[in-house]
């Protein structure tokens, strides 16, 4: 049992040092957990936007062999490096994120004798895998890693049910703690037209659809771009502009397929990584996220807090945040016609205004970041004191 008068030493294990959803969830905790109670470290592959953003009180350690794809040699090297680091630093808690680092980090933590091992479920990779053999391997690894876990944090009840029924996790080991939003930082715009001119360089009357996320297959940005192309070429929504914020492996595909035509280039904007996401959302009218799988997307919550109706794929993680035709539209990934139809329908002023109010009210009443971090803090303290 650890005294509550000494600092609790925690290592958060991530893969990439980006500022996408998973990393920003951790960053919220780093910023809001009291320094007098917690000594927080970050372990990731290398330096990057996330580590550049860290407060001086947060130390960063790097494991260069960490990678997203399965590589037996690199994964074994990463496991050994993590084990040595965790053993040396003598953490009270190791808190892992995402599938790959979640598995390696939890196994290494158990081998290193870390007393408390926490994992936040940000969706399951095996849920979106079509190959049965790959799905089976991913699921087996998750089951094994769950045996190394003191506490699982699920962002919604759907993932909790998957943990219980498919990974055989004891329900008493699971806490459901939804993501949260800074309500002041992500408040609705006072003058949206001014922000469209100032932030995006667009006309005040532009109708802006925005997607924010890492440009890789999971986020499915090409699906959004294809729908945008059809709408632009057929002039279905006059003055519409489609904005994609983020970077990643699919950026070149987006440029090659959707930026060679000048009319498309003017109305399908690829902004790359940006540090002014709150202002970009405030300058937008609708948020779009056609992901293949999710945990609980912080990007959706931030967009809703800003008053943006959301058009998102009908998958676990998304469909617990968006109620169809109440605060947005749920679209099926194999039906681009219904996706395009939803993009057109949401431009109706009455629909837009009602959904916008519903979005903001829901976030204010149920997804406050301060309350979320308080729950995380209580969980940490309870685990360490009672271990």
UniProtKB/Swiss-Prot annotation:
For this entry, list what GO says about its biological process.
Answer: O antigen biosynthetic process
Further details from the record: Activity was assayed using the synthetic lipid carrier analog alpha-GlcNAc-diphospho-decane (GlcNAc-PP-De) as the acceptor.
Keywords of the record, alphabetical order, are: Glycosyltransferase, Iron, Lipopolysaccharide biosynthesis, Magnesium, Manganese, Transferase
Give the pathway annotation: Bacterial outer membrane biogenesis; LPS O-antigen biosynthesis
- Catalytic activity, reaction form: N-acetyl-alpha-D-glucosaminyl-di-trans,octa-cis-undecaprenyl diphosphate + UDP-alpha-D-galactose = alpha-D-Gal-(1->3)-alpha-D-GlcNAc-di-trans,octa-cis-undecaprenyl diphosphate + UDP + H(+)
Q: Does the keyword Lipid metabolism apply?
A: no
For this UniProt entry, the molecular function terms from Gene Ontology, in alphabetical order, are: glycosyltransferase activity
- Out of the domains of life, which is the source? Bacteria
Task: Report what the protein is called.
Answer: UDP-Gal:alpha-D-GlcNAc-diphosphoundecaprenol alpha-1,3-galactosyltransferase
**Enzyme Commission (EC) number:** 2.4.1.343
| Pfam families with a match to the protein in the record | Glyco_trans_1_4, Glyco_transf_4
Cofactors (names): Mg(2+); Mn(2+); Fe(2+)
Q: Tell me, what does this protein do in biology?
A: Involved in the biosynthesis of the lipopolysaccharide (LPS) O-antigen region. Catalyzes the transfer of galactose from UDP-galactose to GlcNAc-undecaprenyl diphosphate via an alpha1,3-linkage. Has strict substrate specificity.
